[in-house]
């Protein structure tokens, strides 16, 4: 690609963001949160200015329109990650809340004293602390998968860690520190072949940057954040 054209395209893209139009800053913290383009800001402003109402609770026009928009957004997200049906999509404030919700709910259903939860050493705190707390509450063991010198998590290490007391495995699909992609699909297949093990994937870094097909991935739960992908 011609570097001059590429540079011009970048300049044009920057014009979609109020921050970048008014400031020459080079923003490199997109793994934490992304800046918002005009299209997103205008859509939010338009809704609150002209269409604001609570969804799912009113029989007047504004409320019914809000419900339709809410469900349309759910369907859009469902198609984006190729979920089997829109009802599989649960809106929360962010991936951290999603993972906390999963930990609190699943621990009540799955964990007994002596059971095991497996996490990797490369997890964001949002996919580590909730499981640590859940394991303590229920008398379960939290087991860590170490990475090798290249930052990889060998599938063999996961297979060795799984026992007949393993109830849940949770891991990131892409590290927020290394940027490395992890083979969650293979991990999910391995876990499910070993028994009724629930598999959770943190897709906070992967969903914004690579194509994610949740049905092909084979995990039981996938968490990600809209605010990390311009929304």
Annotate each PLM feature.
Residues 1-231:
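Pyridoxal 5′-phosphate
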